[in-house]
């Protein structure tokens, strides 16, 4: 049987969105009347069709049932967790790399500098701080558990005392368990829960929120000519299978975040397709996390206008994601991104 996918599009925002929802001309995303839509794109492996929501009633019966089912998921409210407020768009995950070799800030925030930077990110408006002790940049190698833990444990302990919400960026179940005992609120495993076969048991044991991240290959090999039949639909199907996997393994809660993994086993075309069509993933019913900050695709697009921090491209991609209803943005330059969001939202009020 042919499989169809539903992508919401043509969004409206702020006061205009509120008015349109009240007049039943648009549908709210996640029950939030400040962002709504009036068109959907129906996709399959060999076709796509853009229609107004009023045209849904004219679809063939089976397809109409599928679309209506998807829309119920898309318009349903998402419950808050891990200090995220999904009534707001977008939430901010501040990046703290306690590594000597991360792609943009390796070695910059070790020891006391890391703790102080985390406080700065939180005071600037981060909902949560994503702490990592192992680089997963392209061509990076796995490090020993002891080394990874030694890089992060002191900072985790100090942040716990200050009650700063922490996300732990790790692939290793032992690190996860130690972090959870120090108050970690979210597990962010870039391997898609497949690096360590004990990960799923730790997540279940402590009933912790977690991300399902997409990556093709591993950090050392992921950029060696990545290929997909259809990058958008392949990754959507991947998430569906991963949800089945975690349910099969006894995880019943819905405190799950999906991250399509920009730059993790994708070339420029793949990344652009994923970001530009990101609203497809709303039909999975879980918050979407995007990490585009300072990524290489910004350099590939900007070419001779590239800069070390890639701040302009990071802000531009963050605002685009916000306009597509992405619930969480993983960013390095928290203050600047939040400033851009505040200005954007203020302009929407009129």
Where do the model's predicted regions map?
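N-terminal accessory interaction module
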Residues: 1-81
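Active-site-adjacent loop and "lid" segments of alpha/beta metabolic enzymes
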Residues: 1-23, 33, 103-111, 117, ...
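Conserved beta-strand positions in the central sheet of alpha/beta enzyme cores
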Residues: 41, 63-68, 128-130, 167, ...
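Conserved, mostly hydrophobic/aromatic
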Residues: 96, 121, 125, 129, ...
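Non-catalytic positions within long, well-ordered alpha-helices that form the structural scaffold/packing
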Residues: 115, 122-123, 180, 247, ...
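Short acidic/polar active-site loop segments enriched in Thr and Asp
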Residues: 127, 185, 252, 327-328
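Phosphate/pyrophosphate-binding loops at sites that engage ATP/ADP/AMP, CoA/4′-phosphopantetheine
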Residues: 242-255
């Amino acid at each position: 049987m042919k499989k169809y996918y539903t992508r919401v599009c043509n969004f409206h925002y702020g006061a205009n969105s509120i008015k349109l929802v009240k007049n039943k001309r648009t549908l709210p995303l996640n029950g939030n009347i400040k962002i709504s839509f009036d068109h959907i794109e129906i996709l399959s492996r060999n076709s796509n069709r853009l229609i107004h929501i009023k045209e849904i009633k004219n679809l063939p019966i089976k397809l109409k049932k599928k679309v209506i089912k998807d829309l119920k998921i898309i318009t349903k409210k998402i419950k808050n967790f891990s200090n995220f407020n999904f009534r707001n768009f977008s939430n901010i995950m501040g990046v703290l790399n306690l590594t000597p070799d991360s792609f943009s800030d390796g070695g910059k925030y070790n020891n006391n500098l890391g703790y102080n930077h985390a406080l700065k990110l939180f005071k600037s408006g981060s909902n949560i701080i994503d702490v990592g002790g192992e680089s997963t940049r392209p061509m990076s190698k796995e490090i020993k558990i002891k080394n990874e833990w030694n890089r992060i444990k002191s900072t985790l302990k100090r942040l716990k005392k200050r009650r700063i919400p922490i996300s732990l960026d790790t692939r290793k179940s032992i690190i996860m368990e130690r972090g959870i005992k120090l108050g970690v609120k979210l597990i962010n495993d870039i391997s898609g829960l497949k690096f360590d076969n004990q990960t799923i048991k730790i997540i279940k044991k402590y009933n912790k929120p977690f991300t399902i991240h997409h990556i093709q290959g591993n950090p050392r090999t992921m950029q060696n000519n990545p290929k997909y039949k259809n990058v958008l639909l392949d990754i959507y199907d991947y998430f569906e299978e991963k949800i089945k996997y975690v349910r099969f393994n006894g995880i019943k809660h819905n405190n799950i975040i999906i991250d399509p993994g920009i730059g993790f086993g994708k070339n420029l075309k793949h990344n652009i397709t994923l970001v530009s069509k990101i609203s497809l993933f709303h039909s999975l019913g879980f918050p979407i996390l995007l990490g585009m900050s300072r990524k290489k695709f910004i350099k590939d697009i900007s070419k001779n206008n590239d800069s070390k921090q890639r701040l302009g491209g990071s802000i531009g991609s963050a605002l685009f994601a916000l306009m597509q209803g992405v619930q969480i943005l993983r960013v390095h330059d928290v203050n600047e991104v939040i400033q851009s969001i505040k200005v954007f939202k203020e302009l929407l009020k009129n």
